[in-house]
């Protein structure tokens, strides 16, 4: 395919047009008085949202050079969302500001490499200054406040706070659509996996159709159990204890399943069999998780173990297990806390190195199940459009809250970025490096300027007053008042603010140091097919 190439100023100018189109669309959503953006969808009703990354991902420009600029800013938003889960609009605003200020200086003859050095030094200083003024977040009320600010709903703040209290910081909190109009919280404590009993005759409660096992033993294997003789010695040992047994296996079939069911019906033995969760290597990992949680051993050929040789020491134990037709929940496994902690640490290290979103999601699920449970926030709304918008807000709030617990909080509304200006300005740099520092100084003002503009105020006036206000005092754009930001509950997680600044500086520097851009030339439109011979042209308009 033929290529179209632009150089130097032409290349940068084309990319900046794309940066502006995307940033101008996204930045109208910033702050408590931010506006909404309506996105056309191929199917169904349009999506109304003020979520920066959702808007950025939808934008595709016709001009290839402009589209590359837009996609780079979209990458800033996506990267910030991946790291911190929020702050995507702030990152977009900062990127546009650094690109614009930088381009003025590059056009005037400044060296882009020197400017990039200055931007990197100033950004690193600003990040350290942000960390220095951070305040830790602890306690249910503080967590609820962070979530309420991000979601713009006190009720959502309460749900997220309660969910995090119930399942811990490592617990999985999922967001689903409710069948009703109300938003509600549901918590499943213990380890749950999506496999139910293999026979309905194994239930202990015929009304609810569930099997409740109190203080059971657990046999865990990745093998298929077809011959009852393979597990008979073990069954006899368990029978002597008069305690129930849960069998988790690749499958239970052949003569084994009817034999177990028959003994259950006769009241000889309380046993429930379920299939192992997951597939392939993920199944092996999940079985190992269950074994560690319950203090058992996975009977597997990988360890040279056979079912017929298994002893009572290989069985896991738990306080209670509930099995229905679709799922199994293990509560209070008997595994050692040290072994569980080591397993959690291993999964966390795998999370840090994985590049697959799917693998990351599955690892987080495993982490949550080991750490204590799963909370589900079921979102209700009067219309489908409102439901989609509410789900996006709650996702942002949940991510922001986790980030706040992890690294602490600073004054919100862009106030913290103004606070660190003094530290950045104190950097002693020369030449183009100093120019890079000054570009960052100007960009740090931009989020406050945009928040004020969206609320109907003059940004420059607000910034001047903010610079001369006591530490911690900021402008509440929702009410038009000057307040103590943290006491009022207007806060931002440090992780969100620093990620937005770091990602913006990184991509903006790349754009400023771009000297050539290569794009695909548009393909010429294919000619219309020739009309069949003898066909009357008038016939084409007959319908």
From Swiss-Prot:
CDD domains xref list: GroEL
Gene3D superfamilies for this protein: GroEL (3.50.7.10), GroEL-like equatorial domain (1.10.560.10), TCP-1-like chaperonin intermediate domain (3.30.260.10)
Binding site for ATP: 29-32, 86-90, 413, 476-478, 492
Enzyme class label: isomerase
GO-annotated biological processes: protein refolding
Alphabetical UniProt keywords: ATP-binding, Chaperone, Cytoplasm, Isomerase, Nucleotide-binding
GO CC aspect terms: cytoplasm
InterPro entries: Chaperonin_Cpn60_CS (IPR018370), Cpn60/GroEL (IPR001844), Cpn60/GroEL/TCP-1 (IPR002423), GroEL-like_apical_dom_sf (IPR027409), GROEL-like_equatorial_sf (IPR027413), TCP-1-like_intermed_sf (IPR027410)
Catalytic reaction equation(s): ATP + H2O + a folded polypeptide = ADP + phosphate + an unfolded polypeptide
GO molecular function: ATP binding; ATP-dependent protein folding chaperone; isomerase activity; unfolded protein binding
Cellular location(s): Cytoplasm
HAMAP family in alphabetical order: CH60
Quaternary structure, from the entry: Forms a cylinder of 14 subunits composed of two heptameric rings stacked back-to-back. Interacts with the co-chaperonin GroES.
Protein name, entry field: Chaperonin GroEL
Species: Streptococcus pyogenes serotype M18 (strain MGAS8232)
């Amino acid at each position: 395919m033929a290529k179209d190439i632009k150089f130097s100023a032409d290349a940068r100018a084309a990319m900046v047009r794309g940066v502006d189109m995307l940033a101008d669309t996204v930045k109208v959503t910033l702050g408590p008085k931010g506006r909404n953006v309506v996105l056309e969808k191929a199917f169904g009703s349009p999506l109304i949202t003020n979520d920066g990354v959702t808007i950025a991902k939808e934008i595709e420009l016709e001009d290839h050079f402009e589209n590359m600029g837009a996609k780079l800013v979209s990458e800033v938003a996506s990267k910030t969302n991946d790291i911190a889960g929020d702050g995507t609009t702030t990152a977009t605003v900062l990127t546009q500001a650094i690109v614009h200020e930088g381009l003025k200086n590059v056009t005037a003859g400044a060296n882009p490499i020197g400017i990039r050095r200055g931007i990197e030094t100033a950004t690193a200083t600003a990040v350290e200054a942000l960390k220095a003024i951070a305040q830790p977040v602890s306690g249910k009320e503080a967590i609820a406040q962070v979530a309420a600010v991000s979601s713009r709903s006190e009720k959502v703040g309460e749900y997220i706070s309660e969910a995090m209290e119930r399942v811990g910081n490592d617990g999985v909190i999922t967001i689903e659509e409710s069948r009703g109009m109300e938003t509600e919280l549901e918590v499943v404590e213990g380890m749950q996996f999506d496999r139910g009993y293999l026979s309905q005759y194994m239930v202990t409660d015929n009304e609810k159709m569930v099997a409740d096992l109190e203080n059971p033993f657990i046999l865990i294997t990745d093998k298929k159990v077809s011959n009852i003789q393979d597990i008979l010695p073990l069954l006899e040992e368990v029978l002597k204890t008069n305690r129930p047994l849960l069998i988790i296996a690749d499958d239970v079939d052949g003569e084994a399943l009817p034999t177990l069911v028959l003994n259950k019906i006769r009241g000889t033995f309380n046993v429930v069999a379920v299939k192992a969760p997951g597939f392939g290597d993920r199944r092996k990992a999940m079985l190992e998780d269950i074994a560690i949680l319950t203090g058992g051993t996975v009977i597997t050929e990988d360890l040279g173990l056979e079912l017929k040789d298994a002893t009572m020491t290989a069985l896991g134990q738990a306080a209670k297990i509930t099995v229905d037709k679709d799922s199994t929940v293990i509560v209070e496994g008997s595994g050692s806390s040290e072994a569980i902690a080591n397993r959690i640490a291993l999964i966390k290290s795998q999370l840090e190195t994985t590049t697959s979103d799917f693998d990351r999601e599955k690892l987080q699920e495993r982490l949550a199940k080991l750490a204590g449970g799963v909370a589900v926030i079921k979102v209700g709304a009067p219309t489908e459009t409102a439901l989609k918008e509410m789900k996006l807000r709650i996702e942002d709030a949940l991510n922001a809250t986790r980030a706040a617990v992890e690294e602490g909080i600073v004054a919100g509304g862009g106030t913290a970025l103004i606070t660190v200006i003094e530290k950045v300005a104190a950097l002693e740099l020369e030449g183009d490096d100093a120019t890079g520092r000054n570009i960052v100084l100007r960009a740090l003002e931009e989020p406050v300027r945009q928040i004020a503009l969206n609320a109907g105020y003059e940004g420059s006036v607000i910034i001047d007053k903010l610079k001369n206000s006591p530490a911690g005092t900021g402008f509440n754009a929702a009410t038009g008042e000057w307040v103590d930001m943290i006491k009022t509950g207007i806060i931002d997680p440090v992780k969100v603010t620093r990620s937005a600044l770091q990602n913006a500086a990184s991509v903006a520097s790349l754009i400023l140091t771009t000297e050539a851009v290569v794009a695909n030339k548009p393909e010429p439109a294919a000619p219309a097919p020739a009309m069949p011979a003898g066909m009357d042209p008038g016939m084409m308009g007959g319908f």
